[in-house]
Amino acid sequence: MENDAARDRELGMQRRITRRDFLDGVALAVGGAILSAGAPWLSATQAGHEVSAPEKSSNYYPPALLGMRGNHPGSFEVAHRLRDGTFWETAGKPEDTGEKYDLVVVGGGISGLAAAYFYRQAAGSKARILILENHDDFGGHAKRNEFRVGKRLLLSNGGTQSIDNPSEYSKVAKGLLTELGIQLHEFYRDYDSKLYDHLQTACFFDRETFGTDRLVVGMNALPWKEFLAQAPLPEMAKRDIERVYTEKADYLAGMSPAQKRTELAKISYAEFLSKYCKVSAQALPFFQKFPHDLFAVGIEAVSALSCFENPDDYESFKYAGFDGLGLGEPHDQDPYIFHFPDGNASIARLLVRSLIPGSIPGHTMDDIVTARANYSRLDQAGAPVRLRLNSTVVRARHKGTPDQAQEVEVDYVRGGKLLTVRAGRCILACYNMMIPYLCPELPEKQKAALHYDVKEPFIYTHVALRNWKPFAKLGTQQIVAPGGYHSLSKLDFPVSMGKYEFPHQPEEPMVLFMLRCPCKPGLPRKAQYRAGRWELMATPFATFERNIRD
C-alpha cells in the first residue's frame, strides 16, 4: 500500500484536476439526475411536484463536462431496472402530460435526429415531433467535448470520430450530408495532412508484458531489423517479426485466391501467424492488441480475413503476413480525413439546428464548429420539433390492438417522475438491445434477434495538454502499447474549420486521444464484450486517471 501511495504521489494523483461535473447550475443537471435515479419509478402523483427542467439553466452545457461521459451516471439506471424486471413492480401509473404529437422518436442520436428530419420532410414543416433522449446531451455516440486551456478552446469527439468512407454511402445518406451543408471536398482543405509528416509512430513496451519499460520510436518507418534491435524482445521473437514483415512469402501456397479467403475467414489472425507464418508464441504479444481500435478484442478473436480487409485507420501499425498471398490490396478506402474538430457531433448539431431554429446559430458547416448550442431552446412549448433530454423511455405500445390503434403511448421517466405522451407514430431509434424491454408487443423472434448483438466496450479518453513539446522532442505523434492499459495514444486529428484553429505549434495546447478496450483474451468474442462492459461499469474514475498519468 505504501508503494502504491508513493506511486500515486509521483503521478500527481493528489493534484487537483478541474472537473466541471458539479459546478453552479450544472450540478442541478448532473447531480439531480443521479439523485433521482435512486427512485426512478415514482409516479407524478407520488412525487408531488413539477418535473424539473435543468436544461433551462443558463449554465447547462454538457459539452464542457469532464470526468466520466458516454453512458454517464443518470443515463442508464432506469434502463437497468427495466432490464432486470424490477421497474414495473413499483412504478405506479404514469401521469399523462396531455401532449400529443404526430411522431415520437425514442433516441436523440444521429439516427433519431435523422428519423425526425426525414419524417418532417415527408409530413411537412408543421408536423409535431418529440424526440426523447435518456442522456444529458443529444448526439448518442456523436457527442462533443470542449476543453478550455487558458483562453484557448480545444474540441474533440466524444465518440464517433469521422465520416468513414463516404463514397460508399447510399444516395439517401449522401443527400442528407448535402442538405445539411456538408461539402466533403472541403475536408481536403481543412485537414492538415502534412502536420505530422516529420513525426513517427512509437511503440511502448511495458515491463509487465516485456520485462522492462522502453519506448522505441520509428515503428513502420525504420527498417524492421533496426527498430527491433531496440525492442526488449527475445531474439527469436525479433527474427519472427522481422521475417513476417519483410519476406513476403505465400504462407497459403497451393490454395486459389478464393480458397485463401475462405481459410482466412475460418481462422483467427493469431492462428494465421502461428500456424501458417510459423511465428513463435514469444512474438505474439507484439501483435496482440492490433485489432483493438476497430474490433475491441485481440488477435485471437478476430478472423485473419477481417484483419486483411480492415487496415488501421490511424496508420499506427500494419498487419503482417499478407503481402505475399497474391490477394492484392484490400478494397480501396477513402482517406480518413472527413473529420470535424468535434467528430460527428457536428452532424448531430447540424441536424438539431435544422430541426429546431434558434437552438444553434449559424448557417454553414464551418460556423457550426464554434457555435454554442442553446439547450434552453431544445424543448420549447409550442415548437413543431422538441428535443427532451434526461428522459428515459420505459414503454412504447399501441393504444388498443396494434392492427386497429390510432395512437401510440410512450412512457418515460424524467426527474424521477413517470410520464406518458401520445403520438400518431413512434420510431425506436435507440439502443437496440433495450427495445425488447420497452416494446412488449414485439414478436418473440424479433426480440431474440435484437438480444443477439453485444456492444463493443470502447473507452475513448481525451486529455487536454498544456503543450505537445514532449511529443515533438521524441519525434512521435502516436504511441502503440501492445501490453499497455491504453493500447493507443495519439495527438488529435489536425483539422481547422471556420474560426476554429487547430494547434499547429508544439508550444500550443493539444488534445491527446487514448484508447482502451477492456476485453478478456481467451473467452469467445461476445463473452469478452460482456466481461469488458462489466469491467467498465465497475471501474472508478480514479483508475482511469491513474493510468492516464502513468
Language-model regions, residue ranges each:
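N-terminal secretory signal peptides
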Residues: 1-17, 21, 45
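N-terminal export signals
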Residues: 15, 21-43
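Glycine-rich active-site loop/strand segments that organize a redox cofactor
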Residues: 57, 61-64, 139-171, 309-330
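N-terminal Rossmann-like FAD-binding beta1-loop-alpha1 element of flavoenzymes
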Residues: 102-130
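Glycine-rich FAD pyrophosphate-binding loop
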Residues: 120-146
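Dinucleotide-binding Rossmann-like beta1-alpha1 core, especially the glycine-rich loop
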Residues: 150-240
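C-terminal segments that line or cap access tunnels to active or ligand-binding sites in enzymes
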Residues: 328, 332-339, 397, 401, ...
